[in-house]
Amino acid sequence: MNENKDTDSKKSEEYEDDFEKDLEWLINENEKSDASIIEMACEKEENINQDLKENETVMEHTKRHSDPDKSLQDEVSPRRNDIISVPGIQPLDPISDSDSENSFQESKLESQKDLEEEEDEEVRRYIMEKIVQANKLLQNQEPVNDKRERKLKFKDQLVDLEVPPLEDTTTFKNYFENERNMFGKLSQLCISNDFGQEDVLLSLTNGSCEENKDRTILVERDGKFELLNLQDIASQGFLPPINNANSTENDPQQLLPRSSNSSVSGTKKEDSTAKIHAVTHSSTGEPLAYIAQPPLNRKTCPSSAVNSDRSKGNGKSNHRTQSAHISPVTSTYCLSPRQKELQKQLEEKREKLKREEERRKIEEEKEKKRENDIVFKAWLQKKREQVLEMRRIQRAKEIEDMNSRQENRDPQQAFRLWLKKKHEEQMKERQTEELRKQEECLFFLKGTEGRERAFKQWLRRKRMEKMAEQQAVRERTRQLRLEAKRSKQLQHHLYMSEAKPFRFTDHYN
């Protein structure tokens, strides 16, 4: 298996190398051919530019010289003789300046054309040679093995996902027919309350309801006509629900009355007395009776003042915002007085519960704050007592240390310290006396030499005083350390020598 894998890998590597070599060779050949063509074009442009420059120099030279005939005869004689001269015939008159210039330009143009044709032929010949060489190389190459695995692969199906064609439009037609049937059921509907104050009229043409752009219907309200949206009326609960839009128009349908199930603390309310009697006329003329009640969420709907003439003339609803007022007559979608009272009682109970909850929260927060203050004060008092106790213990220890030092002091050591202090005091007195004498002698010193000598002596004296002070400080610290060490040793000996029974000792107090 390993040998097969090795052979496959070698073949794939050889194939990749061949493919890369072929690509590199083709790219190099294309680059060489492009470079050769560009070089030939550049050479052509250079030759043309040189010829034009020569023509310009010749023209300037002819203009500068005063004798144009002689200069033209000297410069252009060989070319003109080659092109214009006839054997056995001598020129009758000298050629004018304009004729000589024209003949010279024509000869130049012809020479340029000849050069361009020769260069074009050379380029064509070079390209043909390259093509022949490439064909020979392709013929000499080995035929490509179609069985070997290729690096570049293409799918059999370039398109992975094909979008199916559009389905038949019968489904859309059925959908629109169902909607028309549904509107046909509601084509002629009269909705009114028990008192006959409000009517809703739906017009029907040819037994079917055509979809309007706005889906509006004509509504009679308090003797006024309005164009309202069908969706708004359906959402407010005017229209009865339709069980099946695809059912036949001749089948009578009856809608059972709904009772308002809004309850307070789990009890049902009374059924509302206001009902809607709706009668629909099908295309054959058979009446269909619907009995419906107002929806559960019945709210007071303000009626807007609408100009009836404009609505009749234009056939569209007036969308201008106008002052709204509540109808004095109790409509089918208004709350009854009992329901209003119950709703008011519910709102009062909710507000009362909300106020009690807020009051309870405020009291709890105050209680928590009071407890936190008490706990903080107790902690602070405890910390103060601890600090005072620590200070008292530290002061007692310091007093004991001072007493132990005085009791355990060596008399010889004390005498030495006293003697040293007296010696230091005497030294200080002598130094002060010397300073006083020097100050008195300064008045008698004359010149700069005496002043400099006095200043140097003063500096030397200051240095010595400073060194003496440092030495005294060192000696004092050394003595204090020795005393502390000796006192600790004595305490240790006393503690070890003293026979102590087993007893409880409170180290913190």
Curated annotation (Swiss-Prot):
It is found in: Cytoplasm, Cytoskeleton; Cell projection, Cilium, Flagellum. GO terms for cellular component: cytoplasm; manchette; microtubule; sperm flagellum. Residues 335-375 form a coiled coil. Keywords: Cell projection, Cilium, Coiled coil, Cytoplasm, Cytoskeleton, Flagellum, Microtubule. Residues 243-266, 300-334 have a biased composition (Polar residues). Residues 46-82, 338-367 have a biased composition (Basic and acidic residues). Its main location: cytoplasm. Residues 46-120, 241-367 are annotated as: Disordered. One of its GO terms (molecular function) is microtubule binding. The keyword 4Fe-4S does not apply. InterPro entries: CCDC181 (IPR026687). Homodimer. Interacts with HOOK1. Interacts with HOOK2. Interacts with HOOK3. Microtubule-binding protein that localizes to the microtubular manchette of elongating spermatids. This is Coiled-coil domain-containing protein 181. The gene is CCDC181.
